[in-house]
Amino acid sequence: MNDSTLALRRERRLLMLLGWVCIALLAGALYLQYVKNEDPCPLCIIQRYFFAAIGIFAFLAAGIRNWRVIWVFELLIAIAAAGGVGTAARHLSIQMNPGFSCGFDTLQPIVDSLPPAQWFPGMFKVAGLCETVYPPIFGILLPGWALIGFAVILVAVASSLWRHRRKLAG
């Protein structure tokens, strides 16, 4: 086995791990929604979409044996993570500044009209307001945890893209 094969195997394992982490995060969101009665707002649902997209791209990439295709999927993961960072940062700023709103009247119909909201309403239907602050977990608000998660994913995947850029030529 050469170094490229070992690196590919390692990368695919890390992508599988990322996919499972995203599933765990979405399961945690459902736990908070249904057990703790913390209704998701439009920005929460958008963050769920980003975590779902990252997980789907990670699982698809893990099944590929071609560096170029993996690189494309990792680029898509990085784009979704960047979108998640922006959404979570906006959500966190709304919760830190109580006079603001996410624009529930504007965002809610758009988010609720997306096809996944029709297919999986328990997961992707809006039921709350962005300015509702739920109890922090270990001193950090939920959008703060999402921001940390998206930022870690973005940095990890961006470093992987940078580290493996030479494999694209080969």
From Swiss-Prot:
It holds the Pfam family DsbB. It is found in: Cell inner membrane. It is a multi-pass membrane protein. GO terms for biological process: protein folding. Residues 1-14, 65-71, 164-170 are cytoplasmic. Residues 32-49, 90-144 are periplasmic. Disulfide bonds join C41-C44, C102-C130. InterPro entries: DiS_bond_form_DsbB/BdbC (IPR003752), Disulphide_bond_form_DsbB (IPR022920), DsbB (IPR050183), DsbB-like_sf (IPR023380). The keyword rRNA-binding does not apply. The chain crosses the membrane at residues 15-31, 50-64, 72-89, 145-163. One of its GO terms (molecular function) is electron transfer activity. Keywords: Cell inner membrane, Cell membrane, Chaperone, Disulfide bond, Electron transport, Membrane, Oxidoreductase, Redox-active center, Transmembrane, Transmembrane helix, Transport. It comes from the Bacteria. GO terms for cellular component: plasma membrane. The keyword Transmembrane applies. Its main location: membrane. Belongs to the DsbB family. Required for disulfide bond formation in some periplasmic proteins. Acts by oxidizing the DsbA protein. HAMAP family: DsbB. This is Disulfide bond formation protein B. The lineage of its organism: Bacteria, Pseudomonadati, Pseudomonadota, Betaproteobacteria, Burkholderiales. The gene is dsbB.
